[in-house]
UniProtKB/Swiss-Prot annotation:
Top-level division of the source organism's lineage: Archaea
Recorded GO CC terms: cytosol
UniProt cross-references to Gene3D superfamilies, sorted A to Z: Fumarase/aspartase (C-terminal domain), Fumarase/aspartase (Central domain), Fumarase/aspartase (N-terminal domain)
Protein name (Swiss-Prot/TrEMBL): Adenylosuccinate lyase
Organism, scientific name: Methanocaldococcus jannaschii (strain ATCC 43067 / DSM 2661 / JAL-1 / JCM 10045 / NBRC 100440)
Amino acid sequence: MELNQIIKSGEKMAVHPIDYRYGTPEMRKVWEEENKLEKMLKVEAALAKAQAELGLIPKEAAEEINKKASTKYVKLERVKEIEKQTKHDVVAMIRALAEVCEGNAGEYIHFGATSNDIVDTANSLLIKESIEIIEDKLKQLRDILLDKAEEHKYTVCVGRTHGQHAIPTTYGMRFALWAAEIDRHLERLKEAKKRICVSMITGAVGTMAAMGEKGLEVHKRVAEILGLEPVLISNQVIQRDRHAEFVFLLALIAQTLNKIGVTVRSMQRTEIGELEEEFDPTKQTGSSTMPHKRNPITFEQICGLSRVIKSLCIAEMDNIPLWEERDLTNSSAERCIFAEVCVLTDHILTLAIKGVKKLKVNKENVERNLELTKGLIMAERIMIELAKRGMGRQTAHEIVRQCAMKAYEEKRHLKDILLENEEVMKYITKEELEELMNPKTYIGLAPQIVDEVIKTLKNKKY
């Protein structure tokens, strides 16, 4: 049975996981065939309108084309039927539109244009819709992270570098750091839209030869009608550096979500246990064989799909060097790339919003881990204090380093080793050392930094 017969019979044939497992209805609706056809028809309508305004085609023809250039009249099934014969989707769309137009209006469809004027401009409309959805979800995630930063502004935890305990920080700092990064993605998208959301009505090789002297006016007017930026120059296609930038921006977003996911997963390790994603113990099952498991599956899915999104950058970058004025190698690739990158990015953003909102900070384990190294995370503070009190900084570093190594090897508390060191005790009393070893009083300006991030980001307008 041929694919078209299967589709016509109503038999489901979902193959790709974005058809049944990943993606939101909102983003899927953008990239479904019906909407793509709608956007192509919208471009044809804008072209006819612009040409009629400039006296290139009859006004009555443009009005009829604009009336009928919709999936209300032009059916996807009919376009597919024609495409079986033409082996060309844009020609099939043009003929299907011409069939429903009254009089001779159909003769003026696609006047002076080439297929990719329609396809590329329609894709820009689809990308614009996708960006709007992604921007909205980025704002949601940023605001949730800011709320978490405020909530945990004073939740002191161990900072880790190289996977090892470093010095104290706060969970407020971590959440604020992520919020600031998400906000930068909003900035990037805002700045890049003028390069990404563009239109092109320039003809077979970009010279506008078929459009005549009014070609530039038509080109600019179509962009105005559609709410896009007209490209400055093109050949037969909008240049793919623009599309590669778009895919790369979504991959950057995915990698930020990956970073958040990696941290959550690491902090949910049994022996760390500081963070935990939402888990419903009344129904949810973590393993088919280990009844006790509570796995960070939401953030694992985010991390896994971020790899797929990242891989799409390579495919789209390979679409930049097309032959001369263009070849068709980008077309088949982009039928996969654009839908996948948008649907998957939207999907993991949706997961991140829910996952971060319900994320639990286990403060008991956070407190336990602060003492896990028996005071070693306070070594920097002791060194700095000794330097402030007159011991040379380099000397202080070496003395505290030796004390820290001894504490580590003997599995003793750093404070006890320091109390035994005569050089250290010349500068610090026992009572002072007791206070200096408190990790909760060594978080620097973390609360103020978090406040500054919250204030700055919440006052931003996009």
